[in-house]
Amino acid sequence: MEWKGRDVISVRDFSKGDIEFVLKVAERLEGELKEKGSLNYAAGKILATLFFEPSTRTRLSFESAMHCLGGSVIGFSSAASTSVRKGESLADTVRTVEQYSDVIVIRHPMEGAARLAAEVTEIPVINAGDGSNQHPTQTLLDLYTIKRTFGRIDGLSIGLLGDLKYGRTVHSLAQALALYDVELHLISPELLRMPGHIVEELRDRVPVHETTDLEGAVPELDVLYVTRIQRERFPDEQEYLKVKGSYQVNLRLLRKAKENLKVMHPLPRVDEIHPEVDGTEHALYFRQVFSGVPVRMALLGLTLGVI
């Protein structure tokens, strides 16, 4: 498939072959970056980052990735400083920014915002998170981290823990993992179960186990992917208070785990992983942060047609 000009909106738009290709390009770029320090593939190209929601890792990692490719970055990190406050529509904002840039990365609280942006522009659009819907670039860096750690994705038993109802990272990741030969364990409070339509889709492809019992599931897992319970996604404060602090990954829990279990987290965390886990061989979440740069370099380079 032609990558130049391609939008990156949802993992549903990717085949397993597409994913594997991105991971190979990312691995190559990681090696080149370590060897040369900086690259010039995107010299003269401009990335526009449109972040209508707060972000630390995703925004900085895209900016770092573009700089590592030799390109430039413009954009904003809050809608408060833009004409959106004056009532400008998302479509008009995106059309305006298109005139200044070669590729757009957008994060927005509205589901479907990234696809809308892609429909009104001629340049590639990359989804950095749209509401509780999708976060495809996080998924790709998660898969990259798993593959670089285990040497494979097929054959692994992977648990997704926490807010599976509103968490866009786990929605995207589960759908991508279903393209592989894996076993999925969906671990959450009853109120935060994975949406039924996603579970049905997963069951058509891979074995899926739903449970509220973290301690019972942990001994089976190769990877435990932890998510925070996101207060900002709850329409009702009382619903949030019922599930707040439902689980914590700590050393006591990890004594029940396989020796080579890896704990992942898209970050930020609150109290769902105790800091005592950070210094163990189980902790993989800061390696995940690093993976964001080569993976996003690959996506930017491919969609710009410079790699």
How should these model regions be labeled?
Residues 1-307:
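Structural/interface elements that position substrates and couple domains in central-metabolism enzymes
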